[in-house]
From Swiss-Prot:
Family named by the database record: Belongs to the universal ribosomal protein uL16 family.
GO biological process per UniProt: translation
Domain of life according to the entry: Bacteria
GO cellular component: cytosolic large ribosomal subunit
UniProt xrefs under InterPro entries: Ribosomal_uL16, Ribosomal_uL16_bact-type, Ribosomal_uL16_CS, Ribosomal_uL16_dom, Ribosomal_uL16_sf
NCBIfam families hit by this protein: rplP_bact
Organism for this UniProt entry: Lactobacillus gasseri (strain ATCC 33323 / DSM 20243 / BCRC 14619 / CIP 102991 / JCM 1131 / KCTC 3163 / NCIMB 11718 / NCTC 13722 / AM63)
Name by which UniProt lists this protein: Large ribosomal subunit protein uL16
Gene3D superfamilies: Ribosomal protein L10e/L16 (3.90.1170.10)
HAMAP family in alphabetical order: Ribosomal_uL16
Function comment: Binds 23S rRNA and is also seen to make contacts with the A and possibly P site tRNAs.
C-alpha cells in the first residue's frame, strides 16, 4: 500500500477542500483517464483496491498510472475514549482529491477495455467520477476568422 517514507509532522490539520484541482487536470501518461467530479479524501486502501480491480480486469495488457498519492495523515481516538486529552493517534493516510483531478490513467489497451477497467475502479472509490480521453487536437480552439 502507498504510504509516505517520512513526514515532517505526524498529525496534520484537516484543511479545506474548496474549489478545483490546481494541477493534474490533463492526461499526461496514458490515453484514457478517470477524473474526479467531486472533492473527497481517498484512503490508501481505496487506491489499492481500485488498482487491483483495474489490473485484474486488464490481465497482462496495458499500463496503469496512479496520479494521486496519500500524503496526509488522519487521526482517530479509540472507541469509548472521552473527549479531551489531546489529539488521537494517526490512523491512516489519505490523498486529498479535488474535483477535476485525473486520478488514474490507462494506456496500451482499447477504449472499451479501458472504459470497463476504469468503471470497476470507480466502484471502489467514494466519489463520482467520469471517463476521459486524451484530446487529439494539440492547440485546442483557435480564434482565426
Amino acid at each position: 500500500m502507498l504510504v509516505p517514507k517520512r513526514v515532517k509532522h505526524r498529525r496534520e490539520f484537516r484543511g479545506k477542500m474548496r474549489g478545483e484541482a490546481k494541477g493534474g487536470k490533463t492526461i499526461a501518461f496514458g490515453e484514457y483517464g478517470l477524473e474526479a467530479v467531486e472533492s473527497h479524501w481517498i484512503t490508501n486502501r481505496q487506491i489499492e483496491a481500485a488498482r487491483i480491480a483495474m489490473t485484474r480486469f486488464m490481465k497482462r495488457g496495458g499500463r496503469v498510472w496512479i496520479r494521486i498519492f496519500p500524503q496526509k495523515s488522519y487521526t482517530a481516538k479509540g472507541v469509548g475514549v472521552r473527549m479531551g486529552s489531546g489529539k488521537g493517534a494517526p490512523a491512516g493516510w489519505v490523498a486529498v482529491v479535488k474535483r477535476g483531478k485525473i486520478m488514474f490513467e490507462i494506456g496500451g489497451v482499447s477504449e472499451d477495455v479501458a472504459r470497463e477497467a476504469l468503471r470497476l475502479a470507480s466502484n471502489k472509490l467514494p466519489i463520482k467520477t467520469k471517463f476521459v480521453k486524451k484530446s487529439s487536437e494539440v492547440g485546442g480552439e483557435s480564434n482565426e476568422g
